[in-house]
Amino acid sequence: MTITTATQALALSCVPMGPGDVYRIVSDSEDPFLVIEGRVSFDETLLPQYSDANPRATEKPTEIPAQVTGLLLGERMFDQPVEGEITLEAHCLGPWCGSLVSGARYLFFARQTEDRVVAVVEPCGGFFFSAEDGSAGDTVLQCHLGGICPSQLPASLEGAVTPLAED
């Protein structure tokens, strides 16, 4: 006699959003957003890590100070030099946590508040895109200048949550 048991495989299913999708979302947001293409440096050891021993430790976002050097999206192009501190707000969803590589170049969308700039780091990517090949910046410029704004979203978003969803 053979006894088999089924275990549920855990997997995070992310909606494949591209820079054009996020550009449209933040453009429609009431919150002021900055679009930055540049190098982000921070202490990677501060990124949240899920632990079975303490699963509740990653329920709240982790704020991480970071330095950014790059260009801010202006009226027609990425032409405004930016250098300074931002706050990375790293989120986890169950055992999956957002992560970045310190020193890498990203195109990212950051919320401007009264006293700081906050960039959300999610398990599914969300607001950060690699800027190493320049394609993310090209896509955002195309959207920004009123051209075709390509989407990577599936035809149906039934049950999906956007990066700006309220908790």
Segments from the language model and where they lie:
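Bacterial N-terminal signal peptides
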Residues: M1-T5
